[in-house]
């Protein structure tokens, strides 16, 4: 049985003297409805008190006791035996029962169960000396506070004399046995084993019995063998005076009430957490049990575990587990009662949260037209229709009904439709790319035209770009701006571009998503850049005329002719008109296309025309000269094994009696305006000094007839150069020449036929010993040929020089 309005009053009695409260020692007030002449019905029960010498006590001792703090309420005494009398203070627990008409109030009979409590702060009459008995002359202190039970104003029907109630009262986490029988209140402390955790307190009926109404004598010691006689007092009924003003409680008694110090309001039994340094209180016992789980050894123990396999959820209460099981069963028993909603939820809490949305629905009302909206944002959007000006400009696209205030706003809106239709398309032949903005199309067109207006101004850089954004991105390299850091711990790498960081992050995943597309190659890579480097190995196996740049000093490979032309425009600054002439001239091919296929031998007349025929039109000469100057055309002839026609009479020590190797014209790296070439004979013992071949003397160059050479200067022992004509005689020093062929007038000449050769035959390459090798090379402006290498390869022993 629980009495919710029964509150403890706590005090401490100091000193070694008497301990009890004398009969009539404390004033109490009668309820307003109690008749004055009724027999005494109040009972003042002191459940615990000093057991050191009886009820008598001096006034000065009581006054001293009221000022000192004491141990906690109902705490088991360890420093003093229950029957001992010595010094020291002890706690007492005071209960004042005031039933109406001598009967016990009954719970559930129309009013709240239990008496209404009121705080008492008056001093009652005390005792003089050490004798017991009432002495109305001198007041004495009754402890820090008393509680008087005041009956409710309305009369309450009471049960008959034979009615009895029994139960347990828990006050500050301490259990007390309680029993009402025939108007008698019985309270007792459970046996010592009942305080153990989990043990239910045993009821002891009839432990402490107060005298019946109308008998103001104290209870006999034999009535309750467990408590001494000074713990039970009877008080006769007295007229209740007006309550005195409340005094502020001293010591720990002020912290007993649920609302701070004990007040006049109804009290609630609180359950205090027994753990040290916690101090939390709870209104219900099960709340305390849930709280105690947090103090268990496993910190947050959850004894209720979901029984379904693979779930693993645990909970502190069985209700939460039950609510969790509904989620497994897909049960949603709590449906929304709103009309047209139809939503259901697993818990009532979720339903209540959902219902708040219905309560706020259409709670925002427009002050102009009284229309309601569910949110403030929608209301604000609606209110603009009342206060904004007219919007005469409407979008003309089908399905779009938006209107605008100004024409510029309409045009800005139309760009959104243009982006959807992708109206900005590239007009370059063969390109079908489309863009949502004209500026992006303009940047794309620069990739076709080769225009790169944004130049890097860093010293020695020279890079240029099609857009400012790419230039700014490039400048991060110069500033070492590596703003994109790898987030993986221990990596520490940083990058200038976000896409580089994205590609690097794949390496931390341990996967290789980039696969080589070449059939039969199963290579995989974790980075796209590694795949690109690997793919170059496969490109070296394809025909080089389709992929290699025709510029002799450039070894870049390309997958299409279009990309190769784009490269020539961007890197080598070749104009579009020159590219068109290059495509139109079928005889002009890159140097890499010159293969080992030999042509038919020519007659003497054709050899003569090689040096004498000059074309009527100068267009071919201009084209060939432009190609040579730009470095596009490089003619590498591997060998020429021919004899020159005509009789060459001996001059001085020169004779034609011995065969000589044909001359070899090697390419150098000087600018094409003054082509420095070296004429070598096929033996290591004989060579000719380096001389200059002027571009003005070259009329036409082609693979077929090789054009016409106006003159080839010849230098003998005399410093005066003389022209080389078809009838001129070529005199060489035959003493140091190794015979390989005979120079006679009836010999048959061969065309300067091409053979397989490297891209650039450098003067230091090993061509000595290759019989019949003659190479013509026109260098480009990008190369550079050192004089040291030339002197190492040339040995001057002859007396004749070919200039």
UniProtKB/Swiss-Prot annotation:
Q: Where is this region: Required for interaction with ZXDC?
A: 271-577
UniProt entry tagged with the keyword Metal-binding: yes
List the biased-composition ranges (Gly residues).
Answer: 13-26
InterPro entries under this entry? Zinc_finger_trans_reg, Znf_C2H2_sf, Znf_C2H2_type
Location, primary (coarse class): nucleus
- In this chain, the stretch annotated as Required for transcriptional activation covers 576-703
Please provide, in alphabetical order, the Gene Ontology terms of the cellular component aspect for this entry: nucleus
Q: Does the keyword Zinc apply?
A: yes
Cite the entry's keywords alphabetically. Activator, Metal-binding, Nucleus, Repeat, Transcription, Transcription regulation, Zinc, Zinc-finger
**Where is this protein found?**
Nucleus
Provide the tissue specificity.
Answer: May be expressed in brain, heart, kidney, liver, lung, muscle and placenta.
GO term, biological process aspect, one: regulation of transcription by RNA polymerase II
| Chain intervals for the UniProt region annotation (Disordered) | 1-91, 120-140, 218-260
Q: Which cysteines are joined by disulfide bonds?
A: none
Please state the residue ranges covered by C2H2-type zinc fingers: 271-295, 304-328, 334-358, 364-386, 393-417, 424-448, 454-478, 484-508, 514-538, 547-572
- Assembly and oligomerization: Self-associates. Interacts with ZXDC and CIITA.
For this chain, the family text in UniProt reads: Belongs to the ZXD family.
Summary of the function given for this chain in its UniProt record = Cooperates with CIITA to promote transcription of MHC class I and MHC class II genes.
| Name used for this protein in its record | Zinc finger X-linked protein ZXDB
Originating species: Homo sapiens (Human)
């Amino acid at each position: 049985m629980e009495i919710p309005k029964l509150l403890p009053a706590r005090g401490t009695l100091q000193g070694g003297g008497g301990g009890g409260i004398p009969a009539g020692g404390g004033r109490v007030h009668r309820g307003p409805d109690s008749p004055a002449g009724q027999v005494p019905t109040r009972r003042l029960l002191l459940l615990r008190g000093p057991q050191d010498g009886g009820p008598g006590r001096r006034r000065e001792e009581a006054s001293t006791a009221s000022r000192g703090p004491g141990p906690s309420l109902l705490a088991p005494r360890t420093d003093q035996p229950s029957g001992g009398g010595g010094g020291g203070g002890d706690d007492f627990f005071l209960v004042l029962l005031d039933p109406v008409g001598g009967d016990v109030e009954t719970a559930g009979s129309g009013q709240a169960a239990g008496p209404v409590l009121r705080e008492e702060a008056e001093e009652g009459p005390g005792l003089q000396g050490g004798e017991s008995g009432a002495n109305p002359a001198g007041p004495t202190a009754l402890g820090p506070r008393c509680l008087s039970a005041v009956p409710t104003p309305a009369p309450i029907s009471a049960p008959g004399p034979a009615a009895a109630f029994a139960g347990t009262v828990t006050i500050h986490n301490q259990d007390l046995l309680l029993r009402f029988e025939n108007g008698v209140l019985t309270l007792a402390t459970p046996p010592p084993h009942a305080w153990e955790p989990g043990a239910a307190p045993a009821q002891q009926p009839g432990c402490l019995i107060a005298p019946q109404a109308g008998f103001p004598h104290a209870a006999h010691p034999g009535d309750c063998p467990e408590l001494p006689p000074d713990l039970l007092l009877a008080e006769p009924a007295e007229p209740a005076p007006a309550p005195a003003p409340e005094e502020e409680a001293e010591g720990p008694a002020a912290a007993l009430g649920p609302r701070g110090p004990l007040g006049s309001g109804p009290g609630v039994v609180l359950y205090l957490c027994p753990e040290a340094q916690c101090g939390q209180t709870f209104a219900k016992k099960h709340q305390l049990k849930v709280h105690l789980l947090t103090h268990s050894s496993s910190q947050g123990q959850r004894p209720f575990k979901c029984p379904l396999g693979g779930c693993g959820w645990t909970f502190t209460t069985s209700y939460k587990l039950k609510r969790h099981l509904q989620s497994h069963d897909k049960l949603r028993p709590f449906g929304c009662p709103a009309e047209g909603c139809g939503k259901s939820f697993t818990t009532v809490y979720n339903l209540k949260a959902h219902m708040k949305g219905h309560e706020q629905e259409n709670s925002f009302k427009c002050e102009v037209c009284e229309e309601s909206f569910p949110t403030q944002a929608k209301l604000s959007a609606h209110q603009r229709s009342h206060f904004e000006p007219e919007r005469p400009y409407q979008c003309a696209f089908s399905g779009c009904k938006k209107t605008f205030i100004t024409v510029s706003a309409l045009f800005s809106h139309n760009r959104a439709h243009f982006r959807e239709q992708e109206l900005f398309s590239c007009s370059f032949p063969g390109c079908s790319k489309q863009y949502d903005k004209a500026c992006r199309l303009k940047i794309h067109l620069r990739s076709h035209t080769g225009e790169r207006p944004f130049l890097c101004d860093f010293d020695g850089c020279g890079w240029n770009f099609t857009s400012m954004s790419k230039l700014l991105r490039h400048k991060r390299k110069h500033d070492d701006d590596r703003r994109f850091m790898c987030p993986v711990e221990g990596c520490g790498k940083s990058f200038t571009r976000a896409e580089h960081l994205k590609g690097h992050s794949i390496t931390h995943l341990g996967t290789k998503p980039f696969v080589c597309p070449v059939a039969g190659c199963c290579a995989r890579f974790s980075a796209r850049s590694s795949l690109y480097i690997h793919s170059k190995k496969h490109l070296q196996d394809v025909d080089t005329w389709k992929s290699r740049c025709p510029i002799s000093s450039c070894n870049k490979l390309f997958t299409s002719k279009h990309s190769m032309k784009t490269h020539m425009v961007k890197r080598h600054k070749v104009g579009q008109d020159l590219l068109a002439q290059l495509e139109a001239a079928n005889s002009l091919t890159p140097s890499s296309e010159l293969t080992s296929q030999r042509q038919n031998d020519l007659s003497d007349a054709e050899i003569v025309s090689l040096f004498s025929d000059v074309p009527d039109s100068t267009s071919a000469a201009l084209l060939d000269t432009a190609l040579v100057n730009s470095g596009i055309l490089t003619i590498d002839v591997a060998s020429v094994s021919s004899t020159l026609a005509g009789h060459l009479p001996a001059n001085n020590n020169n004779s034609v009696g011995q065969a000589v190797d044909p001359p070899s014209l090697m390419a150098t790296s000087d600018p094409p305006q003054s082509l420095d070439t070296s004429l070598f004979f096929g033996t290591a013992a004989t060579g000719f000094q380096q001389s200059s071949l002027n571009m003005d003397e070259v009329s036409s160059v082609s693979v077929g007839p090789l054009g016409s050479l106006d003159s080839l200067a010849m230098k003998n022992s005399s410093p005066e150069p003389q022209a080389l004509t078809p009838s001129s005689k070529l005199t060489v020093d035959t003493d140091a020449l190794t015979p390989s062929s005979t120079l006679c007038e009836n010999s048959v000449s061969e065309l300067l036929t091409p053979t397989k050769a490297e891209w650039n035959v450098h003067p230091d390459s090993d061509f000595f010993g290759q019989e019949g090798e003659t190479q013509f090379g026109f260098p480009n402006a990008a190369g550079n040929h050192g004089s040291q290498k030339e002197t190492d390869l040339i040995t001057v022993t002859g007396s004749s020089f070919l200039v």
